[in-house]
């Protein structure tokens, strides 16, 4: 799906579900990571995440488009366009748009785990962040800490 196809899709969804035309640009933004799409208040454009289309298909993309068009049409008409606004929630229900998009699969970062051991009492510490072993000591016996395992 290219830029012209997504523009046409957004215009069709706008007329079909909202009965109002979409007069601005709809485009894919490759820099979007965790969100399905976003409505830009200053330009009135809609940016969509292409990876959601690749992963979940056109149905999920149409749901994201409907969600962003709710923001668009409410903002254009001067009504409450934010997620917490009553107008927004009512319009979402009326057009059967999702409040949130699905989570991206395989997007979880592998969590690094650092394991430290006290040289004095052999107490082990598991941390997600690396610590400076020259500055910190064991809380139990004040012994020196050494890094024994780094898992990524």
Curated annotation (Swiss-Prot):
InterPro entries with a match to the protein in the record: SprT-like_domain, SprT_Zn_ribbon, Uncharacterised_SprT-like
Cellular location(s): Cytoplasm
Record-linked Pfam families: SprT-like, Zn_ribbon_SprT
Annotated residues for binding of Zn(2+): 67, 71
Keyword terms of this UniProt record: Cytoplasm, Metal-binding, Zinc
Active site: 68
Protein name: Protein SprT-like
Family: Belongs to the SprT family.
UniProt keyword annotation of Metal-binding present: yes
GO MF annotations in UniProt: zinc ion binding
Keyword Zinc in annotation: yes
Broad class of the protein's primary localization: cytoplasm
Residues of the SprT-like domain: 7-148
Native source species: Bacillus cereus (strain ATCC 10987 / NRS 248)
GO biological process: response to stress
Record note on cofactor: Binds 1 zinc ion.
Cofactor(s) required, per the database record: Zn(2+)
GO cellular component: cytoplasm
């Amino acid at each position: 799906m290219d830029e012209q196809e997504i523009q046409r899709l957004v215009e069709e969804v706008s007329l079909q579900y909202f009965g109002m035309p979409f007069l601005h640009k709809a485009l894919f933004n490759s820099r979007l990571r965790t969100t399905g799409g976003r409505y830009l208040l200053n330009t009135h454009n809609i940016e969509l995440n292409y990876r959601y289309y690749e992963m979940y298909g056109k149905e999920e993309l149409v749901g994201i488009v409907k969600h962003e068009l709710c923001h668009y049409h409410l903002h254009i008409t001067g009504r409450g366009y934010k997620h917490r606004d009553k107008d927004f929630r009512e319009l979402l229900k009326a057009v059967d748009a999702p409040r949130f998009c699905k989570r991206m699969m395989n997007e979880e970062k592998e969590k690094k785990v650092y394991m430290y051991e006290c040289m004095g009492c052999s107490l082990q510490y598991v941390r997600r962040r690396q610590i400076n072993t020259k500055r910190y000591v064991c809380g139990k016996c004040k012994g020196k800490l050494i890094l024994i395992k780094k898992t990524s």
